[in-house]
From Swiss-Prot:
EC assignment: 6.3.2.6
Organism: Acidiphilium cryptum (strain JF-5)
Keywords: ATP-binding, Ligase, Nucleotide-binding, Purine biosynthesis
GO terms for cellular component: cytosol
Disulfide bonds: none
Keyword Ligase: yes
GO BP, one annotated term: cobalamin biosynthetic process
Pathway participation: Purine metabolism; IMP biosynthesis via de novo pathway; 5-amino-1-(5-phospho-D-ribosyl)imidazole-4-carboxamide from 5-amino-1-(5-phospho-D-ribosyl)imidazole-4-carboxylate: step 1/2
Protein name: Phosphoribosylaminoimidazole-succinocarboxamide synthase
Reactions this protein catalyses: 5-amino-1-(5-phospho-D-ribosyl)imidazole-4-carboxylate + L-aspartate + ATP = (2S)-2-[5-amino-1-(5-phospho-beta-D-ribosyl)imidazole-4-carboxamido]succinate + ADP + phosphate + 2 H(+)
Annotated HAMAP family: SAICAR_synth (MF_00137)
Lineage: Bacteria, Pseudomonadati, Pseudomonadota, Alphaproteobacteria, Acetobacterales
Enzyme category, top tier: ligase
This protein's encoding gene: purC
PANTHER family, per the entry: MULTIFUNCTIONAL PROTEIN ADE2, SI:DKEY-6E2.2
Length: 254
């Protein structure tokens, strides 16, 4: 196999040059981080599961007209995505108080919010991804007013759809983080959903027991992290046919 050019390595994924113009190969790692990489570890099989879960959710969102960067899954750990200009903002949609919101505002974890709340965080590891307002975003040119209108509209649609999808399999979507990018097609630009959607960037609780089924199990040393990710995939009907002992998958090919 020809060597591929690595373009970027993040905490949970590696991006390689794609086989077609305007595409990238997104490789999912087993590495796990929390608290802006202050805590690090490895969750065996996480990359395989997140690849499948993100593929499934991106496809479902595409079916209701949400534009995404996803093209197709290539193998157990990789998917082909469109190359986009990432907007340096993490968008967090909250349905239930948890995590930093509970800490910041003194709201007991598990409190149902009166309505879904959108928060924005500037993507900058050196600054610990500070929370920012829409005024900051537009004033500093990270996104235009029209970009933000599109992002809010898409975020609420994504939240509505995913909330129902997860509830249908007995999971509460507490909150989640997503990213958007600008997809250029000749002179036309549109905002599309990028990055991934998986238990790495969603808070998912069992609807009956409130048991955590996401990366909080790693953050808070709750144990059984691999089993939680597998349970999410199982409920969505996408657990790979290979047994859990085979979940490591192939190593990255360069």
């Amino acid at each position: 196999m020809a060597r591929r050019r690595q373009l970027y390595e993040g905490k949970a994924k590696i991006l390689f040059e794609g086989p077609e113009p305007g595409t990238l190969v997104q490789y999912f790692k087993d590495d796990a981080t929390a608290f802006n990489a202050q805590k690090k570890g490895v969750i065996t099989g996480k990359g395989v599961l997140n690849n499948r879960i993100s593929e499934f959710l991106m496809q479902r969102l595409g079916e209701i007209g949400i534009p995404t960067h996803f093209v197709r899954r290539l193998n157990m750990r990789e998917q082909l995505v469109r190359e986009v200009e990432i907007i340096p903002i993490e968008v967090v949609i909250r349905n239930v108080a948890a995590g930093s919101m509970s800490t910041r505002l003194g709201i007991p974890e598990g409190t149902r919010l009166p309505r879904s709340i959108i928060e924005y965080y500037y993507k900058n590891d050196a600054l610990n991804d500070p929370m920012v307002s829409e005024d900051h975003i537009t004033a500093f040119g990270w996104a235009s007013t029209q970009d933000m209108d599109d992002i809010v509209h898409l975020s609420l649609r994504i939240n509505d759809f995913l909330t129902g999808l997860f509830l249908g399999v007995g999971i509460v979507l507490v909150d989640f983080k997503i990213e958007f990018g600008r997809l250029w097609e000749n002179d036309d630009m549109r905002i599309v959903l990028a990055d991934e959607i998986s238990p790495d960037n969603c808070r998912l609780w069992d609807a009956k027991t409130n048991e955590k089924m996401d990366k909080d199990r790693f953050r808070r040393d709750l144990g059984r992290v691999e089993e939680a990710y597998q349970e999410v995939a199982k409920r969505l009907g996408i657990l790979p046919e290979a047994g859990t002992r085979d979940m490591k998958g192939p190593e990255t090919m360069q």
